[in-house]
């Protein structure tokens, strides 16, 4: 398990949440993704389920962010209380009215996706969410190197 350190004998590892059920791996559980000399190992952090992929099976690796904008209701009660404390009855009314409506909230999700060719010669993907934001991007970059996939360089403008 690599919650704070790499898996024993691995080059690098990190824990990710699996987004979709995949073979014997259950969704929404944490899995340790560990890179070894010639294969990738995916192991349930608190059990025995695991899967292995040889690097020559892997066709693409993606690590990136998605921003989701959600609408949230404003708290008219909280604003009414604050207005009432500061400015009395009129402040409470103004606070309650200003609290009506919605506000936008941004949620950022970081994804680690591995495309590969299965033993049945089918194209498949394994999608993880990087909920810890610890070493996810480093694992993805190292996996690209080990699979001889093009590593994208960051360009700043």
Tell me the role of every PLM-derived stretch.
Residues 2-5, 61-157:
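Acidic, Ser/Thr- and proline-rich intrinsically disordered linker/docking segments
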Residues 21, 39-42, 58, 95, ...:
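Generic alpha-helix detector with strongest preference for long hydrophobic helices that associate
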Residues 51-54, 136-138:
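A short, polar/proline- and glycine-enriched secondary-structure boundary/capping micro-motif
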Residues 1-39, 45-51:
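Anionic N-terminal interaction surfaces
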């Amino acid at each position: 398990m690599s919650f704070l350190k790499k898996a024993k004998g691995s080059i690098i590892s990190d824990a990710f949440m699996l987004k979709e059920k995949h073979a014997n791996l259950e969704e929404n559980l944490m899995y340790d993704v560990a890179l070894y000399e010639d294969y990738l190992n995916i192991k349930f952090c608190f059990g025995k389920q695991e899967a292995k992929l040889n690097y020559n099976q892997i066709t693409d690796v993606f690590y990136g962010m998605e921003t989701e904008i959600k609408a949230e209701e404003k708290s008219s009660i909280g604003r009414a209380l604050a207005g009432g404390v500061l400015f009395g009855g009129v402040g409470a009314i103004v606070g309650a009215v200003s609290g009506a409506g919605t506000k936008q909230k941004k949620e950022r999700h970081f994804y680690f996706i591995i495309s590969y060719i299965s033993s049945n010669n089918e194209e498949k993907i394994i999608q993880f969410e990087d909920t810890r934001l610890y070493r996810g991007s480093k694992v993805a970059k190292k996996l690209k190197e080990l699979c001889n996939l093009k590593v994208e360089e960051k360009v700043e403008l």
